[in-house]
Amino acid sequence: MKVLEDYRSLVHGIGSLDFSGDAVPCKLLLTGDTAFPVLVTPRKDVLIAASRYGKGKVVVMAHESYLNTNAFMDFLKNAVSWLSPNSEANIGVHKGLNLLTDNLSANGSKVQNTSTLIEGLGVFCTIGYDDSQDKQIISFVREGGGLLIGAQAWHWSYSHKQENVLHHFPGNKIISVSGVHFTSDYGEKGNICVMENIPQAPIYTSFDFSLDQKYLLKGMSQLDISGSSIPSDLLLHGTLSFPVGLSENKQCFLGATYYGKGRVVVATHEGYLSKSELKTIMLNAISWLDINQNRRIGVHKGLRQFAELLQKENIPCNISSLDPDLSVYCCTSYSDAEAKAIHEFVAEGGGLLIAGHAWYWSSQNSDLDVLIQYPGNKILNKFGISILDRTIPGGNYNAINPDESSQQYHFRRGLCNLQAELRSGAEVKPPLSIWMNKLRQDVTAFMRLPANPIISSIQSQFVEMMQICEIPNVTKQCPVSSCSKEAFILCLAQECFNVCDESHILEKEPSITVEIDGTNPGNNAWRSTGLYLAPRKTAVLEFPASAVHQGLQVQVGCQSDDLSSADKYCRAPVVVRRFHVDSQRVSVSCFWGGLVYITVKANSNLGIIPVKVYEAEPAPIYIKGKTSLDTWIQSIRNLPAPWAELITENIILTVPSDAIRSLSDPEALLSLWDKIMVAITELAAIPKKLPRPERFVADVQISAGWMHAGYPIMCHLESAKELTDLNIMQTGGIWGPIHELGHNQQKTNWELPPHTTEATCNLWSVYVHETVLGIPRSQAHCCLQAETRANHIQEYLRNGSNIEQWNVWTALETYLQLQEGFGWEPFKQLFKDYQSMSGIRNENKSKMNLWAEKFSEAVQTNLVPFFEAWGWPIEEATHSKLSVLPVWEKDPMKSYLSARKSNSN
């Protein structure tokens, strides 16, 4: 690692450095992505730092007297050697640093005494109280020069109380471009040991941003981000970043930061820049960014509306790309073409207003990491801000109170507070307890940030912090609150044990070779390997070269529900991990363990892929028509892996292994499931072989309900028996599982949400129970008994056939009456016809009229009176079109309407 080599060059032969003299150092603040601490005190004060800028290097001392003190000379000689672009470089030394001059000269260096930067120098050694040459020194370093500088800012701050030390202190006007700052805080003194490896940087340094927030929020009591624009959330991970706009849940849609000599404001939707309700804050932002009020504003061509807004406010601006002569540049986050130039522009004093969201990019680039590869983050990560793929609900949010800035959520502050709480063992108290959910989300994102010395240091400190904690043993009987310290540990365990150690694995013979079907005409699909990876273990998978970079992923675990929004956890919220197959050898691990899958993206045509797998163990897997029943009974069902799979052509059941230990005839069970799935496809009018088999996965906790649809369909552990017990299925039925399979067949073109969301899926439940299981609808579910059905209809009519009350069983009744009158064939025909229809308006009234029309035509009967009895808003055009057909003489609603009319008389 290059930075470690740099560090060891600087401290070579140095055991300790004595800061116990009269000089009082200041703390140094590190913010840049190339800055690293060289000397850190026990109290975590940085007293020496180094960095790179452009082609050059910088070493910073926390007091100028250290440049002229015997105790530091060996270190300073190392520093000058490291800073020198070559061994023959001329060294310029400030005239007051005679001891340094003598020592460098005695060491064979070519030294010139000078109080200013002059031509021909390779290294310049100076003190940080004169900024008259700041631009020249910055240019000198950028082009490859070395800078050794010492100063402290605490004394200066006494006589400049109204000025911002980070921005106005002379030394900071020189070194801040490198991501190192002098501060007004006293540093710890003493004889400090030099570490063998780079010392850890402080996690958090407190700064008061209240004046900046007041400036930016002047004239704003609320921030209105309602409307169609959906913003992303921001991760403010830099020490000098701060929130400007927050939702009620502390999600940040507007943030700002200092970087080098410049400033940055980030909005997470470009539409906000020209949104009338936010005009005041955007104008404030332009003014805040334009540090010297030069009013040279450049606006990228993608933000023409914002340029027009500025011009209407008499703020001069031009449509342009980035120009170093601008004072403020405004652009979107959707391109990184100017990233390098933007970094230099801001570091050297420019202001950047950048806007855009990342959620759409992430949805279109699901195999890429938004934190690393999203264009905007290639610009912003360096500044200490990242745009996330998480969205924020629109709304009219109260402006934050700058006077309460010390109590505002800040990622680094929260992490520092958590460290103290974990060490103390005490219960988490406000405000940290209020921040825990947001902090957990931010830590998860932060741990994925690209490495640099400061980020890596904080990441490693977090890992150390977590590794001293005991992982809570949560169960359904012993859950933990989502806001608790235990929940935080549970959620982040994977991030802290994210180590794939393959060093010992490849010496062994391959344990198993599996063949994966890489052809997938359906949506993204999981292919079972039949293998299980134990918790905290590492497996290695070897793919043929033809399978690399084809969108394949290795997935460990199948309980894919994210429970992060739950109030309590019976398991960690995320227990599935995925790894891109971007090389022939892929190492995988998961803190929680799990079954191993290869995911094949939609419309892949890769054929059969042989995969060698090291260190995973066989799981109890039965494949209908392939697995020997004798082998199943004798050995497979007794394999120790905790999860089992039962696989047939159109469905895969994943259940606890304990649920199948006594299963002696999986062939008969799966034969029944085959019949069920054929019935599912029959009613849906789709081919009997699904392009992607359905999946059921049992879990101790799921994200919604007793079961929920999707891929996979998730259910509670208690449902495993319902899925795998042939007797239960044949005698009592399985309404719930078929209900979820029905959900997966609902289509937007004929669905009428929210009314039929929990209704039409039950058509499949009725169909399967009657045609496959031989269980009539009145026995399949208690709500379909004749008396209960009649009560649903009567109550609905009694309330005036209000379509707002047409839901679930009442809505299902409409479809059941049609089925009982005309059979299943019209449904099958319509479901088939709808598959080839286009241009259907996604609006319920229009879809109701279309269904009434199509069903009437399918059965050659005018069903308008029937649907109107149910309160459907049938239009005159539909009336007219269907009037040529005979009315439904056996309309079941007639008797209910007649009875109601008689009762009213």
Swiss-Prot record:
PANTHER family: EXPERIMENTAL AUTOIMMUNE PROSTATITIS ANTIGEN 2-RELATED, TRPM8 CHANNEL-ASSOCIATED FACTOR HOMOLOG
Pfam family, one: M60-like_N
The family this protein is said to belong to: Belongs to the TCAF family.
Phylogenetic placement of the source organism: Eukaryota, Metazoa, Chordata, Craniata, Vertebrata
An individual GO BP term: positive regulation of protein targeting to membrane
GO MF annotation: an example: transmembrane transporter binding
Gene that encodes it: tcaf
Database matches in SMART domains: M60-like (SM01276)
Name of the protein described by the UniProt record: TRPM8 channel-associated factor homolog
Function: May play a role in the regulation of the cation channel TRPM8 activity.
GO cellular component, one term: plasma membrane
Domain Peptidase M60: residue ranges: 524-823
Matching Gene3D superfamilies: Peptidase M60, enhancin-like domain 2 (3.40.390.80), Peptidase M60, enhancin-like domain 3 (1.10.390.30)
Superkingdom, taxonomy of origin: Eukaryota
